[in-house]
C-alpha cells in the first residue's frame, strides 16, 4: 500500500487527492468531500479529517512521549530564555544610562529682529524632547511665542527627540537651531 501526503494548500477540488491508496481511495475521497461540505464547522472538521489521515499514515505520535519531551526540555529552555532576557535588559539599562548622561551642543542663531542669546551655544541631554528647547528659548527671551527651525530648513515637532535630530542634522558636532518671533519660512 502506498500512501502520499501532499500539500494542504490545494484547492477544494484537489483535497480529495491528498491521500491516495491503491484500494478504497474513491470511497474515502467521497466521504471526505461530503464531510467537508456538509458541516457548518469546516475548520474543526478539517482538523479532525487531517488528524484521521495522520493516524492512517501512522504519523500520529504518542501523547505520553510528547509530554515527557516537553517536561524535560521546557525547564532548560525557560531558564535559558530568562538568562538571555536578564542580560539584554541590563545591557539596555546601561546603554540608556549612557545615552541620558551624554549631552550635545546646540548653537542658537537668531532670525530677523529678535534678540541674540549669550552664550549662543548651550548643552542639553540627548534624551530631551525639542519642546524643552522651545521652553528654554521662551524663558531666556521672555517671549510668549518662539518659532524654531533646524538648519534654517524645517520646524521639528515638539515631541521630536533632540538626540535623533542631532544624529541626523548635526554640523560640526552642533545642532544649529534658528529662532524668530514670527513665522520665518513658508
UniProtKB/Swiss-Prot annotation:
User: At which residues is the cross-link Glycyl lysine isopeptide (Gly-Lys) (interchain with K-149 in ATG5) found?
Assistant: 186
Assembly and partners are described as: Forms a conjugate with ATG5. Forms a thioester bond with the 'Cys-133' of ATG10. Interacts with the ATG7 C-terminal 40 amino acids domain. The ATG12-ATG5 conjugate forms a complex with several units of ATG16. The ATG12-ATG5 conjugate also associates with ATG3. Interacts with COG2.
Organism (species): Saccharomyces cerevisiae (strain ATCC 204508 / S288c) (Baker's yeast)
> What membrane topology is given?
Peripheral membrane protein
Effect upon mutating residue 186 to A: Strong decrease of conjugation with ATG5
Tell me which GO cellular component terms the UniProt record holds.
Answer: Atg12-Atg5-Atg16 complex; autophagosome membrane; cytosol; phagophore assembly site membrane; transferase complex
Q: What is this protein called?
A: Ubiquitin-like protein ATG12
Q: What mutagenesis or variant effect is reported for residue 108 to A? A: Decreases protein stability
- Keywords recorded for this protein, A-Z: Autophagy, Isopeptide bond, Membrane, Phosphoprotein, Protein transport, Transport, Ubl conjugation pathway
Classification of source organism? Eukaryota, Fungi, Dikarya, Ascomycota, Saccharomycotina
